[in-house]
Amino acid sequence: MGRAKMASQIPPREIPEAPKVGMVSLGCPKALVDSERILTRLRADGYAMSADYAGADVVLVNTCGFLDSAKEESLSAIGEAIAENGRVIVTGCMGNEAEAIRAKFPQVLAVTGAHQYEAVVEAVHEAAPPSMGPYIDLIPQADPGDVKLTPRHYSYLKISEGCNHACAFCIIPSLRGKLASRRIDAVLREAEKLVAAGTKELLVISQDTSAYGVDVRHEERMWKGRPVRTHMTDLARELGQLRTPQGETPWVRLHYVYPYPHVDAVIPLMAEGLVTPYLDIPFQHASPNVLRAMKRPANEAKVLERIKAWREICPDLAIRSSFVVGFPGETQADFEYLLEWLEEAQLDRVGGFRFEPVAGAAANDLPDQVPEEIKEERYARLMEKTEAISAARLSAKVGRHIKVIVDEVGEPDEDGDIGATARSQADAPEIDGAVYLRNVPASLKPGDFAEVLVEDADAHDLYGVIADRQG
């Protein structure tokens, strides 16, 4: 009987290299969350992430299909991925137009619609099968952790899919379906996990945050041994109880909030410091005539009263909104009404859009389409008005101390001065302004909170110094 072969003589078994996936994520923060979920699932299945086209075995393009300009950007991204890599899977909102995509790019491997996670993962498995081995498959996998496409210190928290509104300019319900709320205990578990992992700012997103739980009749779920309703107010209150590992209260920022009556109950939570004093409310217009044509709530006068009441309860409240000019039927009087309303509302942050047709939207067939040159003129005046309001509101902060969260820290200049880019509670990442800091300590890092003395302001941004380093 021969001797057993020594372990050192057994040739090592070659472990197959994990296939790599590249990702291009376009569109809104909700699409970014979809991309994170897809990549998290793929990493759990043994895939690695590629930072460029060349190193990827397959490239995912998560598209946006809301506006024609967004579709053009999506098609351009698909074309670039095909040219640079050749093995491309398309998903996201524009995936609903599979025929159009395949007509332009017949070589795409697969096309799936918005938030069709299983279909995307299956397509990736077909295009680049995960590494399999007789030994690897028997080893329990550790939790790979969630893939994040945002900086470590802030995270988007998606609480629902879809929308029950039927706005004339929008096709979201046809792309993402009716409102479907996530279980509140699942949302809170995700938030708790994110904060424990280093998130300092939670950005609550959906198509209609105020409607959270309507589809499930605000059902109760147990959380920390007590019942909690699937409702925006309960969610905001519970998120306000979270603490970072350092004992800090993370910022909780509410986006896409329709001004339903129960929004009033959130304002005291902001005054108490449990929720960031910031509301992103998509007003879209102020003229009752235009709002009715848009199939939006037309109670702009009541909204002005509520904004005033909100600011009395929480003076630091910042309100962001977006407005569309040139909607079919918008008269000069309607537009002037909007400008007057904005002057009275004194919103802190405003995004403006020229109306553009969206395939499948009811507004395309409305009479009295506004000529492009008038749209441009109104858009320019809208931006001029809102920039003047913003400049005045920001200049009022000069000389005040405010709290900021740091996004980036620069390298020392020739004099050794280190600059940093931060945001105040009035600034959501990527869409609002910034607070630019001078002479920050070398120990400052992204995600840190700091007290800042505001020294200067312009129409969009603030400039300052850490409070204990002034002079």
From Swiss-Prot:
Binds 2 [4Fe-4S] clusters. One cluster is coordinated with 3 cysteines and an exchangeable S-adenosyl-L-methionine. The keyword Cytoplasm applies. Its EC number is 2.8.4.4. Residues 395-468 form the TRAM domain. Residues 149-392 form the Radical SAM core domain. Its cofactor is [4Fe-4S] cluster. It is found in: Cytoplasm. InterPro entries: Elp3/MiaA/NifB-like_rSAM (IPR006638), Methylthiotransferase (IPR005839), Methylthiotransferase_CS (IPR020612), Methylthiotransferase_N (IPR013848), Methylthiotransferase_N_sf (IPR038135), NA-bd_OB-fold (IPR012340), Ribosomal_uS12_MeSTrfase_RimO (IPR005840), rSAM (IPR007197). GO terms for cellular component: cytosol. GO terms for molecular function: 4 iron, 4 sulfur cluster binding; aspartic acid methylthiotransferase activity; metal ion binding; protein methylthiotransferase activity. [4Fe-4S] cluster 1 binds at residues 28, 64, 93. [4Fe-4S] cluster 2 binds at residues 163, 167, 170. Keywords: 4Fe-4S, Cytoplasm, Iron, Iron-sulfur, Metal-binding, S-adenosyl-L-methionine, Transferase. The keyword Methyltransferase does not apply. Residues 19-129 form the MTTase N-terminal domain. Catalyzes the methylthiolation of an aspartic acid residue of ribosomal protein uS12. Belongs to the methylthiotransferase family. RimO subfamily. NCBIfam families: 30S ribosomal protein S12 methylthiotransferase RimO (TIGR01125), MiaB/RimO family radical SAM methylthiotransferase (TIGR00089). PANTHER family: RIBOSOMAL PROTEIN S12 METHYLTHIOTRANSFERASE RIMO, RIBOSOMAL PROTEIN US12 METHYLTHIOTRANSFERASE RIMO. This is Ribosomal protein uS12 methylthiotransferase RimO. The gene is rimO.
